[in-house]
Curated annotation (Swiss-Prot):
GO MF term list: fluoride channel activity; metal ion binding
Pfam families linked: CRCB
The protein's role, per its UniProt record: Fluoride-specific ion channel. Important for reducing fluoride concentration in the cell, thus reducing its toxicity.
GO process annotations (BP): cellular detoxification of fluoride
Membrane topology reported for the UniProt record: Multi-pass membrane protein
Main localization (coarse): membrane
Source organism of this protein record: Geobacillus kaustophilus (strain HTA426)
GO cellular component terms attached to this protein's record: plasma membrane
Positions of Na(+) binding: G69, T72
Activity regulation statement: Na(+) is not transported, but it plays an essential structural role and its presence is essential for fluoride channel function.
UniProt keyword annotation of Phosphoprotein present: no
Protein name (record): Fluoride-specific ion channel FluC 1
Alphabetical keyword list: Cell membrane, Ion channel, Ion transport, Membrane, Metal-binding, Sodium, Transmembrane, Transmembrane helix, Transport
Length: 116
């Protein structure tokens, strides 16, 4: 009964956190999608940690589905990659995708083990 409320509250805070991280990163790295990289890598670690922590179902809804669902972004990653490809920034897009996927999986694994 409370599940949608937990997801909505977590989603609100996740969206706000993503906005703040993205604005901060854009000022520091205007030519590279640092904000998206940060939220996706941090989100991978935190979701792994949550999964390993044995958290209650309500916490998983609030933090995992709500906060992390709004904080991380799959579609922006893809669109930024397409933009780099359109600009023929091949090295940059390879580094971006490799860092996102390889480091993301490793950080999820690490977070899971830290959470245990």
């Amino acid at each position: 009964m409370y599940a949608p409320l937990f997801v909505a509250i977590g989603g609100f805070f996740g969206a706000m956190a993503r906005y703040l991280v993205s604005r901060w990163a854009a000022r520091r790295s205007p030519r590279f999608p640092l904000g998206t990289l940060i939220v996706n890598l941090l989100g991978s670690f935190l979701l792994g940690w949550l999964a390993g922590s044995g958290a209650a179902d309500a916490a998983k809804l609030l933090v995992g589905t709500g906060f992390m669902g709004a904080f991380t972004t799959f579609s922006t990653l893809k669109w930024e990659s397409v933009q780099m490809m359109q600009q023929r920034q091949w090295a940059k897009v390879v580094v971006y995708l490799a860092a996102t996927y390889l480091c993301g999986v490793w950080l999820a694994w690490l977070g899971y083990h830290v959470g245990r």
